[in-house]
């Protein structure tokens, strides 16, 4: 896997020149974004259970039977713990994405095929949207993390919300 540094240096070398000031700014920006993602990952890693519980509470406060539509959500009848387990799973994948700097873990382990699975199990994906939307609106900089870290976290929440919608 190539890093932004090797890419910039390689491009400059191919052009028989030293890296320019804008090349260095690009590298610096990439490093700052990586630091923000790692900050968000660290904060999230220490609070999976609490964050997931907030999402579950938001879902059940808004939808007492655990469903946004006509069908009751499977995890509403089987208990809040299974809903929490699902949120923790997504949050761990979001954490992996923050560390890697891409959406690969979410795509491979959650998003690909999720609508078909939820439909087959009669799970209303809208409840996940409600929970993740609550988490997105709840985040606050600098209380929870820096503004740049919160932006990276919120981008991944948006990615999950849009995939479920």
UniProtKB/Swiss-Prot annotation:
Membrane topology classification: Peripheral membrane protein
Amino-acid positions noted as binding phycourobilin 2 in the UniProt annotation, renumbered to this chain: 83
What GO terms in the biological process aspect are recorded for it?
Answer: photosynthesis
Q: Where does this protein reside within or beyond the cell? A: Cellular thylakoid membrane
Highest taxon in the source lineage: Bacteria
* Post-translational modification note: Contains three covalently linked phycourobilin chromophores.
- Provide this UniProt record's keywords sorted from A to Z: Antenna complex, Bile pigment, Chromophore, Electron transport, Membrane, Photosynthesis, Phycobilisome, Thylakoid, Transport
Which sites bind phycourobilin 1?
Answer: 75
The record's similarity note reads:
Belongs to the phycobiliprotein family.
Question: Quaternary structure?
Answer: Heterodimer of an alpha and a beta chain.
Q: Which PANTHER family did the record assign? A: C-PHYCOCYANIN ALPHA SUBUNIT, PHYCOBILISOME 32.1 KDA LINKER POLYPEPTIDE, PHYCOCYANIN-ASSOCIATED, ROD 2-RELATED
How is this protein named in the record?
A: C-phycoerythrin class 2 subunit alpha
């Amino acid at each position: 896997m190539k890093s932004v540094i090797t890419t910039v240096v390689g491009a400059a070398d191919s052009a028989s020149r030293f890296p320019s000031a804008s090349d260095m700014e690009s590298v610096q920006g990439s490093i700052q974004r990586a630091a923000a993602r790692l900050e968000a990952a660290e904060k999230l890693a220490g609070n999976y259970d609490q964050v997931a519980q907030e999402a579950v509470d938001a879902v059940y406060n808004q939808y007492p039977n655990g469903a946004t539509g006509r069908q009751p959500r499977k995890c509403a009848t089987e208990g809040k713990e299974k809903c929490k387990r699902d949120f923790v799973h997504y949050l761990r994948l979001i954490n992996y994405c923050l560390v890697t700097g891409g959406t690969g873990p979410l795509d491979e382990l959650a998003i690909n095929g999720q609508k078909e699975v939820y439909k087959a199990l009669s799970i209303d994906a809208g409840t996940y949207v409600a929970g993740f939307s609550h988490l997105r609106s709840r985040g606050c900089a600098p209380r929870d993390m820096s503004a740049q870290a919160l932006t990276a976290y919120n981008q991944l929440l948006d990615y999950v919300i849009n995939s479920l919608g």
